[in-house]
């Protein structure tokens, strides 16, 4: 689907509504800075707080603005299979290039339930499907054997692995076909996931430093591990601060500091604590990001 750095793009809000003008500017920012894919309506995009109508407008704008230059991948997961199917059909109808499907959250289903859930969604679309494992948020871990089962479904082409367990990533790599894509879901594990046979990252940090994250990925893919590691280490503290409060609270503060968006979230998310915001701003100044 893509190799390198895709951005899990934030959704800008202004006075409670989506700021579409700001969203266009963000897309242009990523096109100018070599981002390899646009992931819309994911965790970082606050998808769970948006209506069907808002989703439609956001997807439509992303597809139109990108004009096929990079893949537009839409988060269509839900803890209700029927709702996930509706989101998936909507994304396909609006011209998305692929979908990202998170494990059902709160329900805490079995591995059998995961397989049936993902299979129904994959069978309902011609789009490439990327599974999304983030057990810290969902309460459910996709086991490597389950990933291997799903990899046999023709249009299930990869996984965003945000479990933080490199041993699990290695086991997935051992079990799946060679062309099955493994993307890091954690910015602090880009190099480790590459070393486990990964193909890139679906990145939060790319909202702020897209050029640098893609340079890190490109360096590793070109065999320059030393340069890739140098970039990973250079921005380690910044990346840590992006997750000192729950995502996307810090990254929205960071993108706001760049001047692209208002620092606005939808409840139940609230703005960053001032003590943490100051640490983030200080590090951004230190790294000449602002």
UniProtKB/Swiss-Prot annotation:
Per the record, its GO cellular-component terms are:
cytosol
* Example GO molecular function: 4-hydroxy-tetrahydrodipicolinate synthase activity
Question: Active-site positions, per UniProt?
Answer: 132, 160
Q: Name the predominant localization.
A: cytoplasm
> According to its UniProt record, in which pathway does this protein act?
Amino-acid biosynthesis; L-lysine biosynthesis via DAP pathway; (S)-tetrahydrodipicolinate from L-aspartate: step 3/4
Catalytic reaction list: L-aspartate 4-semialdehyde + pyruvate = (2S,4S)-4-hydroxy-2,3,4,5-tetrahydrodipicolinate + H2O + H(+)
* Sorted UniProt keywords: Amino-acid biosynthesis, Cytoplasm, Diaminopimelate biosynthesis, Lyase, Lysine biosynthesis, Schiff base
Q: Which SUPFAM superfamilies match?
A: Aldolase (SSF51569)
Query: Can you tell me which family this protein belongs to?
Result: Belongs to the DapA family.
Function field:
Catalyzes the condensation of (S)-aspartate-beta-semialdehyde [(S)-ASA] and pyruvate to 4-hydroxy-tetrahydrodipicolinate (HTPA).
State the protein's name: 4-hydroxy-tetrahydrodipicolinate synthase
The organism's taxonomic lineage, starting at the top = Bacteria, Bacillati, Bacillota, Clostridia, Peptostreptococcales
Gene that this polypeptide is encoded by: dapA
